Amino acid sequence: MLIWAFVPYSVREGRLDGFDFDTLQSKRELADAFRSLNLAWIWQPITETNLEAVIEQVACEESVVLNLCDGIGNRGTPGPCVVRALERARIRFTGADSEFYEISTSKLAMKERMKSAGVPTPGWEALRDSSGIDGICARVGAPLLVKPDISAASGGVFLRSKVSRDDDVRALRDELTTATMPLYCDARTVFAERFIEGPEFTVFAIGNWRDPASVRCLPPVERVFNASIPEGEKFLSYERYWGLYREERPPPDGGPFYVYADCDAQVARRLEKISRDAYIAVRGRGYARVDLRMDRASGDLFVLEVNANCGLSEDDQTSTGCILKLAGMTLADLLGSSLKDAGVSL
């Protein structure tokens, strides 16, 4: 059995660009994990131009693909095309199938499905044009967070995205739909979502919605924001998330933007239940990370989004790395579970 690790790359000025994947640390982590699992593997760069040739080669062998491609399909970021090609070739693979990938790429599509399934998610309105913005703060409930429908790693979200006036919603909508966005962001559609004042959590979910009994969660963790940050700024903005400061500033005390911590046992049980429900509602398959916030006043939990094909790493500077550390797990444990779900006997 050979494991092909499909890693997303683009071709820029005649050179391969491996985004954040092509690092010595990433390769070492995978090598160590597969050594622990006693599995042979290949690091395979995937671009939109070599995809079909690689698929043809993989299909000729007894292989399984560890699919790490998580792009949104624009500007050379391979993602949905990879999943569709794997499905057409009937190759076993880890991660989201094409249905889950498509749903989870759009925050609006996720929210519609969660609402239909009775999973609590903050109120929202799509801002398809400027004509219906008057009164939105009163209808949805201020403060609002204005953000792109398609966005990863907080792309298109600023501290000033949190607003309480209709005119500010309109201005942000017009700015986002015309501005140059980060690579994993498409702001042609923008929406306004009620901002939930309170703590933030994240939960790693695994399984297949078609078999609800297979869906399980790793222990939830709280994303604890730096205490020196003003209370109203404790949310993920792009500049603070990446430490790329242009119009914003780092935490006043010079410490990290946030750290992760264990959750209270009672809260953890609630988080696992709602995360599992959200994962099933958006037709989760493979694995994903569910982001949630708790209303400080009411104690109610709300699901923000379900991130399919989230990053896999043991690095404790990453969300998954911190989750694994607090759960007492290794990357090999997580990959082994994902590969078993894909039909690999370990």
Sequence positions of predicted segments:
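Short beta-strand segments enriched in small/hydrophobic residues
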Residues: M1-G14
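Active-site nucleotide/adenylate-binding loops and adjacent lid/helix of ATP-dependent enzymes
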Residues: M1-W4, V58-A59, I103-G198, W209-D211
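Short glycine-rich anion-binding loops that position phosphate/pyrophosphate groups of nucleotides
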Residues: Y9-V11, D70-I72, D149-S151
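Glycine- and acidic-residue-enriched helix-capping/strand-helix junction motifs
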Residues: V11-K27
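Conserved N-proximal alpha/beta basic substrate-recognition cap immediately N-terminal to
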Residues: L24-A126
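A short glycine-rich, hydrophobically flanked beta-strand micro-motif that places a catalytic Asp/Glu
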Residues: T47, R188-R194, F201-T202, R283-A297
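Phosphate-binding site of ATP-dependent enzymes
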Residues: R170-P252, D262, Q266, K273, ...
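ATP-dependent carboxylate activation and anion-phosphoryl transfer catalytic cores
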Residues: P212, P256, D262-L346
